[in-house]
Amino acid sequence: MKTFTIGKKKIVLKEEWMVGFITTWIVGLLAHAYRFFNFLPIWDSIYNFTGVGSTYTLGRWFLGYAGLITSMFDLPWVNGAFSLFYISIVVILLTEMFEIKNKGMIVLCAAIFVSFPTVVSSFAYMYTADAYLLAFLLATLAVYLTWCVKKWGTIAGMVCLAFAMGIYQAYATVAIVLVLLYIIRQFVIEKLDFLEAVRKDLKYLGMLVGGAVLYAVILKITLIRYNITLPGYQGIGALGIMSLGQYKAALQKTLYHFRLILGMEHGVEKRVYSILNAAVLLLIGLIFIYLLIRNQVYKKKLSMLASIAAVCLIPVGAYFINFTSPDVQYYTLMEMAVCLIYLLMIIMLLQLDWKTWISKILKGCGIFVLCGLVYYNVINCNIAYFNMNLSYHKSISIAEDVLQRIEQMDEFQNQHDKVVIMGDYNCATENLQIMMPS
């Protein structure tokens, strides 16, 4: 713990904070330096060199303002650095909230978060990545303030959640899953009575509902102010109560996408990522049962049922947007809440010691699997950026060749001629070398 003074105020820096902060940057650079120090545009980037994409029209009334922090330009290093900073603060807040003191576990937490597939997907849209990860921070801060500030924490949490949703609505799911994790911790680790936990947790429900209502109110004012309506894109214009059949379909979509992002859309496959994530889910289940028995939570029926329900509801919470409109389609960009399952595993691993054989096996396997995931994710990040680089250069080469051939035609008049392109150019990335235009 280090202390320094700014004016008359003493600032305390805990070692745990510094470990989380530094790890985020080290692993973040290992995973994403390829992206930060190269210009790798995608389709959206071409017309968003100066901007953050659609804002008010998609209900993202704070996105434009959040993008101003790093200017309105697509700046890979600047936007990437701010993104890493936001993630590192998230790690610090969560280590405080869930009382993670073990430095090794903090390293794993930071490394998993910063290399998660949603972060890679966000960096594909680098012109708005920093704003999206600011939404991640605000959603986390909403739960943290509700937890630690007694008097005005819930209200402050509502404001943070509303602004997180004002950047990207999908980040509300981060707050939902964090509340579920805290409920699990209360029952399984702190061993609170059911009614006592309910009294304590009502403020989190108030924060979630209040934040959503505040977001909706500001959205309504924004729509009136600019005289616009929400489009049908992603079901944004059709939010509301659905039919029972639609809720069933939403649950099916949720379970499919939950398996998909973990690499298990067709069950456990012979792929490293699929096997590692299957091991994570298995270990979470085994450690959860072990803690229920060891801490005698099973003697408190309501507490046990509530903790089981909270675990089962994690996928629903992570994909809650599915249950607000039948037209929602989830993308990796929207799935940051799923990475919190690894936080749940870390929280439970901290309750295991190295004394009994079963505890040793569970803890050792858990640490090994998480280390494997970090390694795999870092490699996978670089592979993703490598493919982005190939795709970009391939596209540029094809476009230049087409343009040259057009300009060589006798009918070509000037640069203002319009060109109609019909058909498809067969140039899959894996065939890059043999499909280059000649």
Regions found by a protein language model. Name each.
Residues 30, 35, 201-280, 322:
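Membrane-lumen/periplasm interface segments of specific transmembrane helices
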Residues 56, 60, 83-86, 104-147, ...:
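Membrane-interface micro-motifs in multi-pass membrane enzymes
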Residues 139-154, 188-192:
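Membrane-interface transmembrane helices that cradle and orient dolichyl/undecaprenyl
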Residues 175-209:
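Perimembrane helix-loop-helix junctions
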